């Protein structure tokens, strides 16, 4: 064969569209090499500095205008507005978490250099997951993110809780990947394609293969996002993991694992609109109610926030039940909102846990405003935001979901959402009350926080309020992301 003719039919990928991913991959290998060869006290400093430089470089590359345009790699990799929005917020939240991770492990009198390069590889998986419709690439990205979280959950080697949480996460996470792969196989049998867009628009006769494949695929995703009844790994993994890792899983992890579900939404409205609404709506209702009811009886605040995370998966799924533009706008906004709120809430716990006397039990929060006033205020903001009190970002998120449900006349699901939010008042307000209206039972002061931690906490607290007062700051990205998916 004429080599020139062969080259003529080969599409050369537009490599500049992979720039953020290339930077992340390079960062991961640099951190891996540095961790191997640099010893002594300077290792922590070098890994931190290189990480900050790398993530800021990734962020800058995402702000270049051409990142928003078109597909590449034979249509298997897309840099549409949704992908870029997810990547920007994933990097920003990772940068907010990074200062806490270093000081947290230092306070535990241990240093895990592998945290830095595993974090970079995990974020690379998030980026790829946000940018593909191809089932094989989706599988690889899901595995990359999942394996990263399995390892990070078990990072505290001396902790039995960490090992137990990581083991449960590994077993159920492996099951979810298997189910999603099984579903992908059925979808391929139906359509002969690995592209979700082609699969769900294909007019084939054996539609039962498509239905079966879609069911298995969605069950696999439901495990990842912690939806009921596939949520069993969430409380133990969140409680056992190092708290900065928990913040990462609750924010960036949830943001990433919801993206395949978001990309499927416009594709199901023609063939499966009613079935989709009922199925996703029922799972959302169960998830909202269960998460909030079980959170009511928790004494450990970290575990309470884990059940709150389950409940918020339900709120987001309620928006996803409306497979229309208005539903997608609500879902994307709520994902961003929850990422900000949950990261902040867990990072407050990470800050308190630096004190060896601190335990995350409710009684230790009594009179926290006396011991750590600015930390108590930040935690207060996150609690009212998670509850959905105006003018916080959580209120806007829940209002958008309620509007989407009302638009689609899903009054039964809207009622369950309001009921669930009312139930959640019990534990969010209880935390606020014990911090501000009870005297301290014993003096447990927070460990000193450095400038990076203070800035991150300030930024997340400000964002929790500012994005509620001025949602227009991010609305352009969210509106463009949703409308682009429905109009192509």
From Swiss-Prot:
Enzyme Commission (EC) number: 7.1.1.-
InterPro entries: NADH-Q_OxRdtase_suN/2 (IPR010096), ND/Mrp_TM (IPR001750)
GO biological process: one example: ATP synthesis coupled electron transport
Record membrane topology: Multi-pass membrane protein
Cell membrane listed as a keyword: yes
GO cellular component: plasma membrane
Record-annotated membrane-spanning stretches: 18-38, 45-65, 81-101, 110-130, 135-155, 169-189, 210-230, 242-262, 274-294, 308-328, 331-351, 375-395, 412-434, 458-478
Domain of life (superkingdom): Bacteria
UniProt record similarity statement: Belongs to the complex I subunit 2 family.
Function in brief: NDH-1 shuttles electrons from NADH, via FMN and iron-sulfur (Fe-S) centers, to quinones in the respiratory chain. The immediate electron acceptor for the enzyme in this species is believed to be ubiquinone. Couples the redox reaction to proton translocation (for every two electrons transferred, four hydrogen ions are translocated across the cytoplasmic membrane), and thus conserves the redox energy in a proton gradient.
NCBIfam families: NDH_I_N (TIGR01770)
UniProt name for this protein: NADH-quinone oxidoreductase subunit N 2
Native source species: Aquifex aeolicus (strain VF5)
Gene: nuoN2
């Amino acid at each position: 064969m004429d080599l020139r003719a062969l080259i003529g039919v080969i599409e050369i990928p537009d490599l500049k569209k992979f720039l953020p991913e290339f930077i992340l991959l390079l960062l991961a290998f640099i951190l891996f090499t540095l961790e191997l060869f640099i010893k002594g006290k300077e290792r922590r400093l070098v890994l931190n500095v290189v990480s900050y430089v790398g993530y800021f470089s990734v962020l800058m590359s995402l702000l270049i205008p051409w990142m928003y345009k078109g597909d590449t790699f034979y249509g298997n990799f897309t840099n549409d507005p949704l992908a870029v929005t997810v990547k920007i917020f994933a990097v920003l939240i990772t940068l907010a978490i990074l200062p806490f991770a270093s000081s947290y492990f230092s306070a535990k009198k241990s240093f895990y250099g592998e945290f830095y390069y595993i974090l970079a590889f995990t974020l690379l998986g998030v980026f790829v997951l946000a940018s593909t419709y191809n089932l094989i690439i989706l599988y690889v990205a899901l595995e990359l993110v999942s394996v990263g979280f399995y390892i990070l959950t078990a990072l505290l080697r001396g902790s039995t809780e960490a090992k137990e949480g990581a083991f449960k996460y590994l077993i159920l996470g492996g099951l979810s990947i298997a189910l999603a792969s099984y579903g992908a196989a059925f979808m391929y049998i139906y359509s002969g394609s690995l592209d979700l867009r082609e699969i769900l628009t294909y007019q084939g006769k054996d539609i039962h293969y498509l239905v079966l494949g879609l069911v298995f695929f969605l069950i696999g995703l439901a495990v990842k996002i912690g939806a009921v009844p596939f949520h069993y790994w969430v409380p133990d993994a969140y409680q056992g993991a190092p708290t900065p890792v928990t913040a990462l899983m609750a924010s960036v992890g949830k943001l990433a694992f919801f993206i395949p579900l978001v990309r499927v939404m416009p594709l199901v409205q023609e063939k499966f609109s009613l079935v989709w609404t009922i199925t996703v709506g029922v799972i959302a209702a169960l998830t909202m109610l269960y998460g909030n009811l079980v959170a009511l009886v928790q004494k450990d605040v970290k575990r309470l926030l884990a059940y709150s995370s389950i409940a918020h998966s339900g709120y987001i799924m309620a928006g996803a039940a409306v497979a229309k533009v208005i539903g997608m706008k609500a879902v994307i906004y709520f994902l961003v909102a929850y990422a900000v709120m949950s990261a902040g809430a867990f990072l407050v716990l990470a800050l308190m846990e630096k004190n060896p006397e601190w335990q995350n039990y409710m009684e230790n929060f009594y009179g926290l405003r006396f011991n750590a006033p600015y930390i108590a205020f930040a935690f207060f903001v996150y609690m009212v935001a998670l509850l959905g009190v105006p003018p916080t970002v959580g209120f806007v998120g829940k209002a958008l979901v309620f509007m989407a449900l009302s638009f689609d006349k899903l009054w039964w699901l809207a009622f369950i959402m309001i009921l669930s939010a009312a139930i959640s008042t019990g534990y969010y307000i209880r935390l606020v009350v014990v911090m501000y209206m009870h005297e301290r039972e014993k003096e447990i002061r927070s460990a000193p926080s450095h400038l990076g931690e203070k800035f991150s906490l300030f930024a997340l607290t400000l964002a929790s309020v500012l994005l509620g007062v001025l949602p227009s700051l991010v609305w352009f990205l969210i509106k463009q992301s949703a409308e682009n998916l429905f109009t192509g």
